[in-house]
Structure formats: structure tokens, C-alpha cells
Design a protein with these regions (language model features):
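Fungal secretory targeting signals
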Residues: 1-37
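Carbohydrate-active catalytic/glycan-binding domains of CAZyme proteins
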Residues: 27-360
């Protein structure tokens, strides 16, 4: 998702691409409870990865497979053509997020319903954008269901961007979260001026029926977008695009409750991308590498250098420490944008490589 935090700077930011810069870094913040560094637990059954993303080429979903058990080396599949396209809503899909079901028997893809390339402006996309999520499911990552066009936002929400989901063991359901600008339709029926972005969440058991959304993160005037979450040793770690002390970048926070309000999340680090040496970034995506990964078990935080390079990997062996290092020497598809890397079994990896084999 294009970085949009303070709506008053939207037009100037668009005009400045790809020369956008962040304010000075603020560094690591030792706030909140300190969690002891632990050995990284991992699943020895996973022997590769799939990478789902959209591209600077268009607003569709693409797929790459890892070259062996290496989270830093991928080959784009299907002759570089998308594996999923939208036939509903705005006609484009961005920010695809994939998760394995809690039972482990299927996969879900959630994506943003948005097509800037079809003529929608970023301003209109925030004022009267889609209130829907685009959702697919599959048992094998090869054969996908029909597209589900699911309304999750009420009519006073201006957009529904960059959805992700995480299974909450306490609530026994999936928590789905996304960014929206929220308006007072009576006082501001034209949704002008544009509202700042908030992170909201809803719950679902089946990705068909959703609860009414609730506000999760509300931080005016700059707002928050693009949250991604991982759980380790009973603690949730959340990474979000936000402006902290003048630095519009990725912030890391922790909490023992996934749905806790902003005040109950403890800030670990801010300005993560710039501190690591990236260009301006958004669209963070966090995952844990496999036990047998050629570079060992660790955490990788993907960050989207949306000015042109796409995803770059940052690494850490300690989520609680808040120190992230920009990795070099990786091999990703050309300019992959906001998406997800998911661990696979060898059978799953070989399955997608065969089904979407490159023939050109």
C-alpha cells in the first residue's frame, strides 16, 4: 500500500516519488516489560517457502518459490504471470496476505480491493474507496476457490487496506486487521477533508462472516497503516507503519493480548527501516524462517521500499531486542511489493513448482 499517513501531505508525497525521505531516526526505545531472549523454536517439517506479492507491473497476485530451504532466494513462477486476478470490486488486488489455517488443512489469501492503474486516484481511494476484502482459499496452494468479495467495513469507512489475520488462541478465532479512514457521514458526507488512517480489527471463524470492526490503533494526526504480527513465547510482536518522533517508518511493539488497545502495547523500537539503512519503507511483513533454512532459524521482517525497489529483508534473532539488520545478497523477484512469505513442506514446495512451472 502506498504510504499514506497524514492526508494533508498526500499530493506532495505522490509528486515526490521516488525521492521521499524520512525524518531523523529515533532508535530503540526500552519501553514496557523486558522479555528474556530465547532460543528460536521452529518447525522442522518445513523445507521451503512460497512468496505471494503484487508487483509494480500491475495489481494482481504473483507467486515465487524458494530455491531450496532459503528464505533469501526465490524464483518467480508461472512465467512471470499472475496466478490470481480480480473480477470483482475495483478490479485490482494489492497487498496479498496468506496464512495457513489454524487446523493446518487449508490456506487463505486476503487482499486489498484497489486498482490505481484503472484510474482511481489516491485521494478518491481514501474518501470513497472499497469497503470489501478479496479472499481466496485453497487446500494445496494450486487450486484456488472462486473469489470472495466480502464487505467488512461500514459505510463511513473510506477504505479497507492491507488486511492481515492471526489466530488468537485466547479468543479461539481469527483476528483480521486492516487500515481505514473513518468519517462522520452526517457532518462530512463528502469525506472531505481526507481522514487519517486507523488500524481496525474484526473477528471471523470462516473468512466469510465477520464481526463489526473495532478500532485497534488510533494515533492522530498522522495515523497508522500496514500492521503485521507474530507471536513468540506467549508475546505478540506487532510491526506497523507509523510516525514516531517525526520519523515515518516501521515501529515495533509488544503485548500479551492481540486485541489490546494502543495504550497496552509497549514500544520496542521505532524508525526500524531507516536505522537499518533502507529507503523510505512501508508494508512490513514478519515471518520466522525454517529450522533447516540454509542460514538458520531467525526472524525476517520484509519492508517495502515503495519508491521502486520493492521488498528488502531485515533480520533479527531477538524479537524483544528491537535490533534489525538489512540483509544483502538476497535474490527476490523483480520489485515485489507488499505481500507474504510462508513456510512450506517439501511436498507443498515441489507442488507449486510443478503446477506453475516456467516454460519460457
Amino acid at each position: 500500500m502506498l504510504s499514506i499517513l497524514n492526508p494533508t501531505t498526500l499530493l506532495s508525497a505522490l509528486a515526490a516519488l521516488p525521492m521521499l525521505t524520512s525524518a531523523s531516526p529515533t532508535g530503540t526505545i526500552p519501553a514496557g516489560p523486558q522479555f528474556a531472549k530465547r532460543e528460536i523454536s521452529c518447525n522442522s517439517n518445513y523445507e521451503g517457502y512460497a512468496f505471494f506479492y503484487f508487483s509494480n507491473r500491475d495489481e494482481n497476485i504473483y507467486l515465487a518459490a524458494s530455491n531450496g530451504n532459503d528464505a533469501l532466494s526465490f524464483t518467480e513462477l508461472n512465467n512471470g504471470k499472475p496466478i490470481l486476478t480480480s473480477t470483482k470490486g475495483d478490479g485490482g488486488v494489492r497487498d496479498p496476505f496468506i496464512l495457513r489455517s489454524h487446523e493446518g488443512d487449508k490456506f487463505y489469501i486476503l487482499a486489498t480491493d484497489l486498482c490505481i492503474g484503472c484510474g482511481t486516484s489516491w485521494g478518491d481511494a481514501q474518501r470513497f474507496g472499497s469497503r470489501y476484502l478479496e479472499i481466496w482459499e485453497s487446500k494445496d496452494l494450486i487450486n484456488w476457490s472462486a473469489q470472495h468479495h466480502v464487505e467488512v467495513s461500514p459505510d463511513n469507512y473510506g477504505n479497507t487496506w492491507a488486511p492481515e489475520a492471526y489466530y488468537d488462541d485466547d479468543l479461539k478465532t481469527y483476528v483480521v486487521y486492516w487500515a481505514s479512514g473513518i468519517y462522520d457521514n452526517e457532518a462530512n458526507p463528502n469525506h472531505d477533508p481526507i481522514e487519517y488512517q486507523r488500524m481496525v480489527y474484526a473477528t471471523t471463524d470462516d473468512f466469510i462472516t465477520f464481526s463489526e470492526p473495532k478500532i485497534w490503533q488510533d494515533e492522530p494526526p498522522n495515523g497508522r497503516i500496514d500492521s503485521t504480527v507474530i507471536k513468540a513465547d506467549g508475546v505478540y510482536y506487532r510491526f506497523t507503519k507509523a510516525t514516531i518522533n517525526g520519523c515515518a517508518d516501521i515501529v515495533e511493539e509488544s503485548s500479551t493480548s492481540l486485541t489490546a488497545g494502543l495504550e497496552d502495547w509497549h514500544q520496542i523500537a521505532s524508525c526500524i527501516g531507516k536505522n537499518a539503512g533502507t529507503q523510505e519503507v512501508e508494508g512490513p511483513s514478519i515471518f520466522k524462517t525454517n529450522c533447516k533454512d540454509v542460514n538458520g532459524a531467525r526472524y525476517i521482517l520484509l519492508a517495502d521500499e515503495f519508491g521502486g525497489n520493492g521488498y528488502v529483508p531485515l533480520e533479527s534473532s531477538d524479537l524483544a531486542g528491537g535490533k534489525w539488520t538489512l540483509r544483502t545478497g538476497y535474490k527476490y523477484p523483480e520489485s515485489p511489493r507488499h505481500g507474504t512469505i510462508i513456510p512450506l513442506t517439501l511436498e507443498e514446495l515441489e507442488g507449486i513448482q510443478k503446477a506453475f512451472v516456467n516454460t519460457d
